[in-house]
Regions:
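Sec-dependent bacterial lipoprotein signal peptides
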Residues: 1-20
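Bacterial Sec-dependent N-terminal signal peptides
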Residues: 16-45, 181
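N-terminal helix-cap/turn-to-beta initiation motif at the start of protein domains
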Residues: 26-32, 143-152
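Tryptophan-anchored aromatic micro-motifs
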Residues: 32-53, 57-59, 124-127
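A mature extracytoplasmic/lumenal domain signature
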Residues: 43, 79-81, 92-94, 149, ...
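Surface-exposed helix/loop patches within compact recognition domains
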Residues: 55-146
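Short, hydrophobic/aromatic-rich segments at coil-to-beta transitions
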Residues: 58-62, 151-157
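Edge beta-strand at a domain terminus
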Residues: 141, 156-182
């Protein structure tokens, strides 16, 4: 009888240990990113991403995003191909400013609204080092552009920008893009 009680107690202890340790996950698997375009708190679930083929030939990325539900809005993301795969801190001037003699593209982000032939900049950021021209973001703002293949038809793009007026953009995309001719 003592052996039976001992085995039942041991069995219960093992079950309790398994139940308490079963879901203690110190290294959870991160949720996969989903494609999203959020401008000033409004989510645009469907959008199209274009990359300028002509500008690729000059060593730069010129990317345009158009929400399906609002054809008046255009998101523009630009930077040198030298930034490919780099996470740029948008609170700082473009690191290529420090390269002697560099005259290529700096990072640039814009959101434009075009109605009745009139363009209005809703949000803008630029990594130039001229005090009157640099429009930097706030802590945590980044631009990350990575071409995922040699022919530049697949990209991973991440952008978060908040301007001095606290207007914000959050954009993430990983997938195929359309190569556009100007």
């Amino acid at each position: 009888m003592k052996n039976f009680l001992f085995l039942v107690t041991l069995y219960c202890e093992v079950l309790c240990m398994l139940a308490s340790c079963g879901k203690d996950d110190d290294n959870p698997v991160p949720e996969p990113e989903i494609n999203r375009f959020v401008l000033f708190g409004k989510t645009y679930p469907a959008f199209t991403v274009f990359v300028s083929k002509e500008v690729l030939g000059k060593g730069n990325y010129d990317i345009y995003v158009y929400p399906a539900e609002d054809n008046t809005i255009e998101l523009g993301l630009q930077c040198s191909m030298q930034h490919d795969g780099m996470s740029l801190d948008l609170t700082k001037y473009d690191p290529l400013n420090a390269v002697p003699g560099y005259s290529g593209w700096m990072w640039y982000i814009s959101v434009e609204k075009t109605e009745e032939g009139k363009e209005e900049y809703l949000l803008e950021g630029w990594g130039g080092d001229a005090p009157t021209m640099g429009i930097l973001g706030v802590a945590g703002d980044i631009l990350y552009i990575k071409s995922l293949n040699k022919d530049h038809t697949q990209f991973e793009i991440r952008c978060k920008l908040t301007d001095p007026e606290k207007r914000s953009l959050v954009f993430y995309y990983k997938g195929n893009v359309t190569l556009a001719t100007e």
